Amino acid sequence: MPKERLTEELLERLLASSTPEAYLDEGLTIDRRLPDYLFQLLGEKGMKRSEVVRASGLNSTFVYDVFNGDSRLGRDKAIMLALGMGCTLRETQRLLRLDGVSELWAKNRRDAVIIWCVEHGYSRTQTDDELYRLGEKTLLGTGPLR
């Protein structure tokens, strides 16, 4: 699989194009679906779906439906799945985008904690512990609410 170009690089090329068609004719856009990306990540990380289910804390039937394209995750479950797969921050942001939800934003207190946890390789349970410790809603929806 060819290396995917960074969004920033593509944006520069689009803005430098004389017309939208000139950019589109370069064939740089992709039409990727979430299930395709999830299977790509599984292969890259050498994981099985059952391992992702255990590590993410999500319902197995639901996870299998997401991988089949029959269900959408929603933001917190997408983050849980990314943590369960050991995703990098870039992979997590891409997973969130492909699910159609907002990316993690460093200006948001809760998101900042999650970003830090992803960057430091925390598991889903470790991330929930950190969120709880700092008074934020956990990914499982429990914990102190301000």
Residue ranges and their predicted role:
Residues A16-K48, T125-P144:
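A short, Lys/Arg-rich alpha-helix, primarily the initiator
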Residues L83-M85, R110-T138:
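Long, compositionally biased
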Residues L42, V53, A82:
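The alpha-helix within a helix-turn-helix
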Residues P2-R5, L11, Q93-Y122, G141-G143:
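Short, charged recognition helix plus adjacent turn
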Residues G57-L73, L98-G100:
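Recognition helix of helix-turn-helix/homeodomain-like DNA-binding domains
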Residues D70-L83:
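Short, basic-rich loop-to-helix N-cap that marks the start of a DNA-contacting helix
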Residues S50, T61, R90:
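Key DNA-contact positions within bacterial/archaeal DNA-binding proteins
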